[in-house]
Each structure stands twice: as structure tokens, then as C-alpha cells.
Design a protein with these regions (language model features):
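Hydrophobic alpha-helical segments
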Residues: 1-163
Length: 163
């Protein structure tokens, strides 16, 4: 499944292609591009940290690796993602990256635990309200996508005709 977009990966995994086509044609494509590629607000690489946090909590190895790869591509370094994969939420990151990861993990683990103190911590490290919204959206989108990836079944591989 290397190099597949999230909608393609879900289509690849599903045992009900009609459902996956609906999913990929509509909701995910619109949300994915609106949330991850929108101009302004949080940087693309920081949105990827939010998605990595969600994918780690949900144990979606495929998605975590895709987001890590994208983060490394955007920043031209795999230092941050290597630290995250080695030490999880305790990774020694910049204050801003650490706060982004911590919040995305908390939001993914137990959404109702996210509170004013978390928002204040994000503001303390320099995030504005628009960036915080982008973080909530990117983390939530991939928390949802991770859950779908886990339950749609095993990958459907094309059969080879040996005639």
C-alpha cells in the first residue's frame, strides 16, 4: 500500500467496495484537502504531527508512517519523527512541537479530557486560535480515518489469472 492516499488505502482494504467508493468520493476527499492543504493557519508539517499523534494512539502503523514520511519531506528532516517513534509523547522536541504532539495524543485518547489548560499551553508556545483549530481538525480527521482503516477488513488483493 505504499504511496496510496488515505482514501485509496481505505478502498484497498475494504471488503465492500461500494461503501468505500462513497466514502472516498465524498467525505474524506473534501475533508482531507480542506484540512490538510488549506492555506494559512498551522503549517503543513505541524498538521502532520497532529495526525501522527492520532495514528500512534490508534495504533495505525500505516497512517503513522505515511504522516511521518510527509512530515520528513516537508521539513527535509526525519529528526522529529524519529524522536516521536522512539519516545512517543515523551520525545525531546521543541516546546511547540511537544505541545502539538501532547495535545493530539490527549485529544485522540480521550477527547473529553481536552480543556482550557491545554488550549492555554498551546497558546503559550505560540499557537493562535486558527492554528489550534487546524490542530483539532487534523488530529480528529485522522483519528476517524485510523478507526475506519482498522475495521474495514483485510486488504483485498487482485487475483492473478494463471491461464
Amino acid at each position: 500500500m505504499k504511496n496510496l492516499t488515505t482514501p485509496q488505502a481505505i478502498l484497498y482494504r475494504t471488503t465492500r467496495p461500494s461503501l468505500a467508493r462513497y466514502y472516498t468520493a465524498g467525505v474524506t476527499s473534501i475533508c482531507l484537502y480542506a484540512i490538510m492543504y488549506d492555506k494559512g493557519g498551522m503549517s503543513r508539517s505541524e498538521r502532520e504531527i497532529g495526525a501522527i499523534g492520532a495514528s500512534i494512539v490508534n495504533r495505525c502503523i500505516y497512517c503513522a508512517s505515511v504522516h511521518a514520511s510527509r512530515h520528513a519531506q516537508l521539513t527535509k528532516s526525519d529528526e522529529v519523527t524519529d524522536k516521536i517513534f522512539a519516545d512517543g509523547e515523551n520525545a525531546k522536541l521543541s516546546a511547540r512541537d511537544a505541545a502539538i504532539l501532547k495535545f493530539s495524543v490527549k485529544l485522540s485518547d480521550t477527547p473529553s479530557r481536552a480543556d482550557k489548560d491545554d488550549f492555554n499551553e498551546l497558546k503559550t508556545v505560540g499557537l493562535n486560535e486558527e492554528e489550534i483549530l487546524d490542530l483539532i481538525l487534523s488530529t480528529s480527521l485522522f483519528g476517524w480515518a485510523n478507526r475506519l482503516m482498522h475495521v474495514l477488513g483485510d486488504p483485498v488483493r487482485p487475483t492473478v489469472n494463471e491461464d
